[in-house]
Design a protein with these regions (language model features):
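Terminal targeting signals and extreme-terminal segments of soluble enzymes
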Residues: 1-114
Length: 114
Protein backbone atom coordinates (compact mmCIF):
# COMPACT_ATOMS: atom_id res chain seq x y z
CA UNK A 1 0.00 0.00 0.00
CA UNK A 2 1.27 3.47 -0.88
CA UNK A 3 1.27 5.81 2.11
CA UNK A 4 -0.45 9.20 1.84
CA UNK A 5 2.77 11.21 1.64
CA UNK A 6 4.13 9.15 -1.27
CA UNK A 7 0.73 9.18 -2.97
CA UNK A 8 0.57 12.98 -2.84
CA UNK A 9 4.15 13.23 -4.12
CA UNK A 10 3.50 10.92 -7.10
CA UNK A 11 0.27 12.71 -8.05
CA UNK A 12 1.87 16.16 -7.78
CA UNK A 13 4.86 15.07 -9.89
CA UNK A 14 2.61 13.49 -12.51
CA UNK A 15 0.37 16.57 -12.74
CA UNK A 16 3.30 19.02 -12.72
CA UNK A 17 5.04 17.10 -15.50
CA UNK A 18 2.03 17.63 -17.76
CA UNK A 19 1.85 21.42 -17.47
CA UNK A 20 1.95 23.12 -20.85
CA UNK A 21 1.13 19.91 -22.76
CA UNK A 22 -1.96 18.47 -24.41
CA UNK A 23 -2.75 16.88 -21.05
CA UNK A 24 -3.19 20.27 -19.37
CA UNK A 25 -4.99 21.66 -22.43
CA UNK A 26 -7.59 18.91 -22.00
CA UNK A 27 -7.75 19.54 -18.22
CA UNK A 28 -6.70 15.98 -17.41
CA UNK A 29 -5.68 15.54 -13.77
CA UNK A 30 -4.24 12.53 -12.00
CA UNK A 31 -6.38 11.92 -8.92
CA UNK A 32 -5.39 8.57 -7.40
CA UNK A 33 -2.52 6.11 -7.40
CA UNK A 34 -2.00 2.75 -5.74
CA UNK A 35 0.49 -0.09 -5.82
CA UNK A 36 -0.56 -1.09 -9.33
CA UNK A 37 -3.00 1.51 -10.64
CA UNK A 38 -3.25 5.15 -11.68
CA UNK A 39 -6.45 7.17 -12.07
CA UNK A 40 -7.01 10.37 -14.04
CA UNK A 41 -10.09 12.53 -14.59
CA UNK A 42 -11.11 14.85 -17.39
CA UNK A 43 -13.92 17.37 -17.00
CA UNK A 44 -16.13 17.47 -20.07
CA UNK A 45 -16.89 20.99 -21.25
CA UNK A 46 -18.03 22.35 -24.63
CA UNK A 47 -14.38 22.93 -25.65
CA UNK A 48 -13.97 19.12 -25.68
CA UNK A 49 -17.10 18.49 -27.77
CA UNK A 50 -17.30 17.29 -31.33
CA UNK A 51 -19.79 19.17 -33.58
CA UNK A 52 -22.68 16.92 -32.42
CA UNK A 53 -22.29 18.32 -28.89
CA UNK A 54 -20.76 15.31 -27.14
CA UNK A 55 -17.24 14.50 -25.96
CA UNK A 56 -14.85 14.13 -28.90
CA UNK A 57 -13.44 10.62 -29.29
CA UNK A 58 -9.95 12.05 -29.68
CA UNK A 59 -10.18 13.57 -26.21
CA UNK A 60 -11.22 10.17 -24.84
CA UNK A 61 -8.26 8.56 -26.61
CA UNK A 62 -5.90 11.20 -25.22
CA UNK A 63 -7.17 10.50 -21.69
CA UNK A 64 -6.65 6.75 -22.12
CA UNK A 65 -3.16 7.18 -23.62
CA UNK A 66 -2.20 9.65 -20.91
CA UNK A 67 -3.17 7.48 -17.97
CA UNK A 68 -1.79 4.28 -19.53
CA UNK A 69 1.59 5.71 -20.52
CA UNK A 70 1.94 7.60 -17.25
CA UNK A 71 1.17 4.47 -15.23
CA UNK A 72 3.77 2.53 -17.22
CA UNK A 73 6.36 5.21 -16.52
CA UNK A 74 5.54 5.35 -12.80
CA UNK A 75 5.57 1.59 -12.27
CA UNK A 76 8.50 0.72 -14.54
CA UNK A 77 11.28 -1.07 -12.71
CA UNK A 78 13.89 0.17 -15.19
CA UNK A 79 14.81 3.79 -14.61
CA UNK A 80 16.95 3.97 -17.76
CA UNK A 81 14.03 3.23 -20.12
CA UNK A 82 11.25 5.55 -21.25
CA UNK A 83 7.99 3.69 -21.82
CA UNK A 84 5.40 4.83 -24.34
CA UNK A 85 2.12 3.53 -25.66
CA UNK A 86 2.30 1.38 -28.77
CA UNK A 87 -1.33 0.68 -29.57
CA UNK A 88 -4.65 2.14 -28.50
CA UNK A 89 -8.15 0.78 -29.07
CA UNK A 90 -11.16 2.79 -27.94
CA UNK A 91 -14.79 1.66 -27.79
CA UNK A 92 -17.35 4.36 -27.11
CA UNK A 93 -20.38 3.01 -25.29
CA UNK A 94 -22.32 6.23 -24.84
CA UNK A 95 -21.87 9.93 -25.49
CA UNK A 96 -21.48 12.49 -22.72
CA UNK A 97 -21.87 16.26 -23.03
CA UNK A 98 -21.00 17.33 -19.49
CA UNK A 99 -19.58 15.88 -16.32
CA UNK A 100 -16.37 14.03 -15.61
CA UNK A 101 -14.87 11.00 -17.31
CA UNK A 102 -12.48 8.81 -15.33
CA UNK A 103 -9.74 6.53 -16.63
CA UNK A 104 -7.99 3.89 -14.54
CA UNK A 105 -4.86 2.13 -15.76
CA UNK A 106 -3.98 -1.26 -14.32
CA UNK A 107 -1.45 -3.72 -15.74
CA UNK A 108 -2.59 -7.06 -17.04
CA UNK A 109 0.77 -8.56 -16.10
CA UNK A 110 3.65 -7.19 -14.02
CA UNK A 111 6.89 -8.82 -15.16
CA UNK A 112 10.53 -8.29 -14.30
CA UNK A 113 10.76 -4.89 -15.97
CA UNK A 114 7.23 -3.69 -15.37
Amino acid sequence: MIDNKLKKFILKEANDRCKGTLVSTLDINFTDVGETFLVAEMHVTPKLHQPAGVLHGGATAALAETVGSSAAAIFSKKEDQMLRGVELSINHVRGISEGTVIAKAEPIHMGRTM
